Regions:
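Active-site nucleophile-adjacent alpha helix/oxyanion-hole segment immediately C-terminal to the catalytic cysteine
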Residues: 1-67
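Short acidic, gly/pro-rich beta-turn/loop elements at beta-sheet edges
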Residues: 27, 144, 199
Length: 202
């Protein structure tokens, strides 16, 4: 008798973890953003309809300019992710009156010690209205959201269901020089009150 097939999960056939990381990052940042009035607390998390709309906006921009849908399968590089984060800021400005400020603290650096990355993430994530997106190198090739740094672990909000990542796994304990997380693939997100002139910056 043929073996019962295993169900495919999100990510098995698509490379949309970058899009999911942006959506999850915004959801987490909204969770801790200080709303001015208590009655707005219930509006911290976007509705399913809002999340679907944001997902469509990001997906449309990802494939724009392509005569095929390969970006959906092949995934998102750091340049594309940065562009999509800017589009997300436009969406937040329209729907929430907020702007999403994006920083790449180690952009252009070939190597950053694990402890320095962890310290930077930890200091950033204790602030309200923040999240971080990391790109994990091959063989995983995956974008994920960091919500907290705890001891020697990164606590995640991950589209593939992973709950944490050990620093020893991706840092100095890794055989490759830069570890599993390249400095260019670290994005710090912060929500602020919207100003039309405010854009995502490197």
């Amino acid at each position: 008798m043929p073996r019962r097939p295993t169900a495919l999960e999100q990510g098995a056939l698509d490379g949309l973890c970058g899009v999911y990381s942006i959506v999850n990052g915004i959801v987490w940042a909204l969770r801790t953003y200080p709303h001015p009035r208590p009655q707005k607390q219930g509006r911290r998390r976007p509705s399913d309809e809002e999340l679907g709309d944001l997902f469509i906006v990001l997906l449309s921009n990802l494939v724009r300019g392509h005569s095929h849908l390969k970006p959906i399968v092949e995934g998102t590089n750091s340049r594309q992710l940065f562009r999509l984060l800017s589009k997300s800021s436009d969406w937040l400005r329209k729907h929430r009156g907020l702007a999403l400020v994006t920083r790449r603290p180690f952009h252009g650096r070939p190597y950053v010690p694990t402890t320095q990355v962890a310290q930077k993430l930890g200091r950033h994530l204790v602030r309200p209205g923040t999240a971080a997106i990391l790109g994990i190198e091959a063989p995983f090739d995956h974008w994920t959201v960091v919500r907290q740094v705890a001891q020697q672990r990164l606590l995640l909000l991950d589209s593939a269901g992973t709950s944490q990542l050990s620093m020893k796994t991706w840092g100095e304990g890794c055989s490759r020089k830069t570890g599993l997380i390249h400095p260019d693939n670290i994005f710090l997100l912060k929500l602020t009150k919207s100003k039309r002139a405010r854009k995502a910056v490197a």
